[in-house]
Amino acid sequence: MSTLSEDLTPRPAALPAGSGVVATARVRAGHNGHVTTLPLLSSDGPFHLQRLRPRGGMARVDVIGAMSGPLGGDRLALHADAGPHARLQITAAASTIALRGPTDAPATYDIHLTVGDDATLHWLPQPLISTAGSNLRQTFTVELAPTARLVLRDEQILGRTNETSGNLTTRLTVLRAGRPLLDQHTSYGDPHPAWDGPAVMGSHRACGQLLVVAPSLAPAAHPPVLLGDPDTPAHGALAPLAGPALLATAVADTATQLRYLLDEALRRTLTP
């Protein structure tokens, strides 16, 4: 895992024309002075966007997979925009499964999140499963206004039961008020060297992170802390960033263990 300081705008890989599905889904939330509204819900390709009943003052959208994907050669994107004062939560009905496709070209899945002044966005999907033989490049690009609030959960399962991981590359780039807050680039599976060595995953096959950004967060009040029980095969850490933000990273043997650690991290961020 490496943290980068240059070239902060991820660039999707160029793929041959006609090599797979090309689709972009879009969500836009606004605030009309009373409640959060959803003036734009645009489904496309494998993404079906389902409006859910609001909860706790938040508009909610569920992403439902309408077809298999991403497959090799697909170019998929999802854009979500929470306008000023809007409160939006995005979840997923099921895991995203990266599969081998009809072409050797990689699939790309680009997620772009924009959060305006005094707006809140919770991005809480189910895990991404990288199956054997798949080849996926996933990017998150997050742009936050100075007073924006964000909760972002990102989980990967490297291979199904008794299966090796596919070729998975992920990048998370977060800008706050136009300045870099986090830029993280990680690669798993062949041909990436040492991804399953002790410095990265070891024997674990589930990994993830939770990022919480809020103007009210005081990093000094949240010193780094270890997550989980040292005697269990699940480990993590919660640490402050150079800004009003906390980042939890964790590895585990199963998706259930991983979610437990990230939920623990979220509880700790909500504790003064």
Where is each model-derived feature located?
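N-terminal intrinsically disordered, cationic/polar leader segments
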Residues: S2, E6, A14-G18, V22-T24, ...
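N-terminal, charged/glycine-rich beta-strand/loop interface patches
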Residues: S2-P127, A132
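A short, polar/proline- and glycine-enriched secondary-structure boundary/capping micro-motif
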Residues: F47-R51, L99-D104, G133-N135, T161-S165, ...
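Intrinsic-disorder/low-complexity, polar/charged segments enriched in Ser/Thr/Lys/Arg/Asp/Glu/Gln
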Residues: R75-A77, R137, A245
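Short, hydrophobic/aromatic beta-strand segments
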Residues: I90, L150-R153
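A structural signal for small-residue-enriched, beta-sheet-centric alpha/beta enzyme cores
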Residues: D154-P272
